[in-house]
Every structure is written in C-alpha cells, then in structure tokens.
Amino acid sequence: MKRISDFIAEELAAAFEAAGYDRNYAKVTLSNRPDLCEYQCNGAMAGAKAYHKAPIMIAQDVVAKLEGSGCFCDVQAVNPGFINLKLDERFVADYLDEMETDEDLGLNKTDKPKMIVIDYGGPNVAKPLHVGHLRSAIIGESVKRIARKMGHNVLGDIHLGDWGYQMGLIITELKERKPELPYFDENFKGEYPAEAPFTISELEEIYPTASGKAKEDEEYRERALHATYLLQNGHKGYTAIWNHIMHVSVNDLKKNYANLNVDFDLWKGESDAQAYIPDMIERLKKEGFAHVDDGALVIDVQEESDTKEIPPCMVQKSDGASLYGTTDLATLVQRVEDYHPDKVIYVVDKRQELHFVQVFRAAKKTGIVPSETELKFLGFGTMNGKDGKPFKTREGGVMRLENLIAEIQEEMYKKITDNRTVEEEEAKNTAKTVGMAAIKYGDLSNQASKDYVFDVDRFTSFEGNTGPYILYTIVRIKSILNKYQEEGKAVTGLKVNQQSGESEKALMLALVKYNEMMENAYEELAPHKICAYIYDLANAFNHFYHETKILAEENEAKKQGYIALLILTKRVLESCIDVLGFEAPERM
C-alpha cells in the first residue's frame, strides 16, 4: 500500500505536468502551518527561475489543474508561491479503511529483502548485567524488530565477551580455591564432571575477586595470563572449565534478557572468531595489506579526505597476541562466510566510534567484507542519573540491571495499587508489563546517540511522554471496545466515518502517517521516531475521546465509524509498541 504522501505527490505531479511544468517540482511536505492545511508544495518557487515566471503564477496554474481532485477538499495558491493542500475527508477515511483491511496496516514493505546482521548486547560472560548493558540490548532489539517489520531478513547476534584475560582470572582463582578439582590435574585421563564446580552467584563473585588480586599481586597476574595462554592453546582441563563457565553464564544471561523481552538469534562470541584468525593474518601479510610497525602488525586506514588522524588498525601485538580489532575482523570473516549479509549494524557505545571506523575501513580495504556490504555504526549515548553522571546505586556503585528492573516494577506496583483494590497477582503482572514499558520507552524515546537522564519518577508517570501513558491509552481503547461488544455488537467490517469534528480529523491524520513513519524509522535506525509518533497519536486519541461521546452516540452509523477508528488506533499503537519491545496489559 502506498504512503499517503505518495498519493498526494502523484496527484500534484500530474497537475504540474498538465499545466506545462516539470513533474519533478511536485515535492510534497507536511505543512509548517497545520492551522491552514495538512500538506504543502513549494515546487512553484523552485521552478520560477527555469520558467522565467513569478512563483505565484506557476502555483495558480497548478491549482487550476487540481480542480475536482479526489485527494483534496481545498487547494490554494498563496504568496509568494506556496500551494496549500487540505485533504478530502472521504479520501482520508478510505485510506484508513484500506489500512484496516491489511494485516500489515498498509505498511509499504520492501520487495527486495536484505540480509541484515545486528551486533548488539555484547556482555562479558561470568559478570552480571548492569545498567550499562541496557541501551545496546533494547536499542538493538528495536532496530531488529523494525527491520523485520519492513520485510528484511535479520539475525541478532549477542557477540559475547567470552575469550581472553577474564577467563584466565577465573581459572586461576578457581584453582586457588579448589586445587583438588580434576581440571587442574595434568595426569587426569577420565571424563570431566558434567556439573559445573560453581553456581552463577559464585561465578559472579569469583571474577571481581580475581581481578582485584591481579591488580595488587604481579605473580597472581602472571599466573592468570599463563592460564589464559593455556586455555587459548587448547588445555583440556581449562577448556572444560571454560565450557562450564559458558553454560552457567549463558543460561543466566538468557533468563535476564528474557526479562527484558530481548531475544537473540545467535549466541556467538569472541571465541567463535578465533578459528578464523590464523588464516586471516596470513592472508593480510601475504597480500601486503598488513605491515609491521614498532613490532606490531597493522593495517593503514588513513584516507586523503580525513581532516584528522585515523590511527592504523592493529591486528597483532608484538608478542603475537590478538586484540579487539583482530577479533572484530575475524568475526566479519565468519559472518560474510556464513550469512552473506547485505548490511551489518553494530549497536555499541558511541565512544567506540574510532575503533569501528578503523575496523570498517580495514575490512573494506582488505576485501574481508565485499564493497557492496554496508557496515553501519549505531553509537548510543550514556544513561545518566539526575545528577547528570552515569546512573549509579544510592551508594554510588554500579547498579545491576535486574535491580533496576525490580525498582521500576516496585514503583509501578505502588502506583497501580494506590487508592484502589486490585488482586495481588494481577497487580504484580501489570506492574511487570507497565514497568517494562516505562524502562524501554524512557530510553528509546531519546535519540540513540544522545545522553539522557533516567528519571524513575518521570518514566513511571501515567501522564506525559512516557510508556505508562501510551499503555494507559491502549487500555482505555480496549475498555471501550469491550463495552461495545458487551452490547452484543460486532467489531468487524466497520467503516471509518468522514470526520465530523476537529479532534476526529486530527486522529485520522495522525493514523495516515503510520506507513511513512515506520519506513523513516527503519531508514534512519531511529526507534525514537516511533516513540514520538505514538505519543502524538495517543494525544490525538485522548483529545478525541474527551470531546466525543463514543458509546453514547445515538446515530448507530456514526458510532460504528467511531469504533472503526478506535480499532485502527489500537492496532497501530500495538504494532508500534511491539517493535519497541513491550506490550499492553488488558487492564490498568
């Protein structure tokens, strides 16, 4: 189904052509004076020079050709040459009816699906998720859902930090605590135990303890580095411990991400890239892409057009060890080989931008990634507390993500049960659902690249630009529709009215923008545009609701038109919150 702006542009283009002007001047935009009209065209001013005519004369010629158009109820040429366009009420109602009959709400899905890999999440195993992991997870999840909504094939990859020094630290500390375990017996020949020698809570305590010791004790640090080396070179006992770490940690991560309604298609990590590194390094050296600089192997990525220095991409340290850049390039080798992506999107902290500029340039320069494959950096800003500094616990420590979620749910529970009687189980379930909306909407309503303040009081409010307000609007619509059906009336096959009031018209005009908005959110990887849209849509509905006696309307045809409008509003809102990664309860 075409966007409403496409219908308008086609009508305008035909009018420009019929008036003797180039149809390419028929560019349509939303009006910057919505009190006068809904859309406008400034093409007459753009064409004035080419046709040696006053813009107002061109505008008048075009307006004359639009007489009798089914799209518009009023078209005016306004000095110095604007064409103001007011949409015909029947045209808008018919467009909405067509949206309602389409399971995709008229979404203009791509007819050329791309294979897209999204790299997001990126936690380290054996460490608890903290608030710093929130943004990558929920922004990446939303971008994935938006791309799928637009018809693309998408794989979400968590890209675990599961290889390297932290593993050596855990192995070293475990050996100190439990030296009798068979993993540390070089003469052990049997099967290693199937059960891990630690729980997730023990594992999460082992790592910081080991890390602290290594900073204070050089000999301990050397042992941890040696354990890392042995693991990476296939030590059987250490590999068995690593498998236990992965099993225990990944199961816990899956539980925590499920609580965030975040789901990954691929649970690969840095360890999966290791097998690709030797051949990749060999090729880079053999084909002259990499050279030795101060003992390290590097790829030059500076370009003539650069206005500042871009350091070389280092792929091997002087001692032969790999770096993050090595792993990221090897991961791209694996992704190209296994998935043949048209696009790879990295949802990471914006402070890592230089690193990814280096990696992307190295990948393209060396042919690791085909020239036609797009590599996209989606950098996000910091989630701050009310003091403007990175969000912390009241004691000043790093807050665990599960504790933040619990705090928000507790706040929602208080607000849901305040001055009203609600069954305990229902109140808890509703608090969980609405709390998730508070967190996700609070984050996603900000442009990804911007820092923002995580304000628990504001985000959990049922008023203003918040997730709970959006859900309250959906629940209000559900309640009206339920009452309508309780009267024994069907909610299928209903048609939207030609608008009879300003608030009804405003709601209808908000709904017709859905298609274009979703397309734009995909093109710009911008979940915040969906948030802005549904806030406007919710406001338009609530204004209509307060001005209109929907169920008390005596004219049955008119009432049915209202109900049709409500059904479509609910579907559009639910479609949008689905791609944002949360849902609405039945009651609030």
Where are these regions (language model features)?
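Short, charged, solvent-exposed linker or helix-capping segments at domain edges/interfaces
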Residues: D94-M99
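Non-catalytic interaction-recognition regions
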Residues: M1-A93, T110-M588
